[in-house]
A protein has these predicted regions:
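Cell wall/extracellular polymer interaction/catalysis modules
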Residues: 1-116, 121-123
């Protein structure tokens, strides 16, 4: 398996689901390794990359967005800007460019039957 940095991501708040309840659209995806497949998205009216078999979650897409309110429980892709103090800002820029890059890689890998996995870690 080849791991390649393509972009940064933004998703909802981490919640330890062993201790607290999931909050729909506001809870980070549990740590784990998930297959990616394409499915039709009614929201975007096109085939989009979705994470498969995430426990207690449905419809987790990888898509564009810039702010935490844009996630609705999905993974947003882009570049985390840094403030003048060097601290990462809780938002994304260049989301569309990042999505186009990652979507192209996902599409090529699935088409060539390599398969694609997303690994979620809390760092």
């Amino acid at each position: 398996m080849q791991c390649v940095y393509v972009c940064d991501t933004l998703e909802p708040t981490f919640r330890d689901l062993q201790k607290v309840k999931k909050v729909k659209g506001k809870t980070a995806i549990p740590c784990g390794e998930y297959d990616v497949r394409y499915r039709m998205s009614m929201k975007f009216n096109q085939n989009m990359p979705y994470l498969e078999d995430v426990p207690n979650f449905k419809g987790i897409m990888i898509h564009t967005g810039n702010n935490p309110k844009d996630t609705q429980g999905c993974i947003l892709v882009g570049v985390n800007p840094r403030g003048s103090n060097g601290i990462v800002m809780p938002r994304l820029v260049s989301s569309r460019d990042s999505f186009n890059r990652i979507n192209d890689l996902i599409y090529k890998a699935i088409k060539s039957e390599e398969g694609v996995k997303v690994i979620i870690m809390n760092v």
